């Protein structure tokens, strides 16, 4: 049989299997929705009170027709004016700025045609406030969040979490930064503190977003776009003064992984990650950032030449993706931010027998993310601190399962992305997913890539792993079984210190993390943060019990 025919038949078979089950995941009534139409708690006196409304809208990203998007419209009801920062000409939601231990109320209104709910990525909140898919609200309904900011200062974010629709809603624009501010006076502030939300998108000739164009392939592999969008806007560059900057970087893409580096060969100076500042600055030639992860980067432009352009790039790497009979992805060239530099070369086109086209660029291709143009203006220059606050490490002698970590195997089987052989069920919690309050455990995550059967054995992909409700410490990355080509292409790009809530699990890698379950009982979730994998069911509940 010709290769093209074999590939076409394989794709058709997968489509028949996946699509009905995916639709079932989106619409089934197994969730038995809890009562979530809450009223304001009169005894909860909020320091910051915000209204967020998810609604369809339009934004002028490019010349010509406006782009239809979803966005969070916001209103500050109570709090300092700096608590809510809008981004002009952007589809992204506002930046919410708070301080540790402040009481926060968010009145979430849904004006979307589909159900939705907000997850506060990285925040330590009660399970009712976490944005579990069971709490989704319909069009015209409201959910009121009330919680205390019980996190270190750092860069967090919020996004929708309805099962089966998370990928689509985030892709269409629903996301925003949630910054817990510090009171340090030795770091760049105001105009020198710059958010960079990195996302990849596809647009048609009418400037409209295209999602799951290659329906089955995009779901199986995860959506990959052909244009980079920074901060939800079309600008591909910004002017910087001759001063020092603090960049808060979020990988807000659905599935794309970035190997971030400076174009001039300078080291990346990393000062923070998911859980805020690390103990001291670390210099890296590049840093790996998977979907959902955050890093904080320090850069001094004070000695650069006027009009010099320095770019933030993503370097090439081997992701270890193996798709078996489904075939690999066609390799393209450089993708640049903005329409005029969009990638148009290297797109694979199937023959007439399949009538399928491939318009994507592999994970691991070289990309230009954003350009910085050094102006002739002198800016504020702040010396780089030699250290920040120390981070208390878990006492592993007090871990309750020190000699037998819980194991979670992320793999492909029966045409599904699974965890320990199971898919997501709205209320199910297996016995091996129940943990005791006020205990510390070790969890070992394994990317075996495959379950049973020949097709499964050929399916390998990296998975960004996210755990709700807490932050953890990475204890070990076992790379002994990881392909040498894969590991050598990114081995210098990991910072496994400090507090994290998301990490990259490469094919054949094992990662052990230490977690402490405190303050709250209830059901939380853990999942692959490749949003298409998550929507397909690569997500499970865990329950904290007394």
Task: List each model region and its residues.
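Residue-level signal for mature regions of secreted extracellular proteins and peptides
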Residues: 18-19, 521
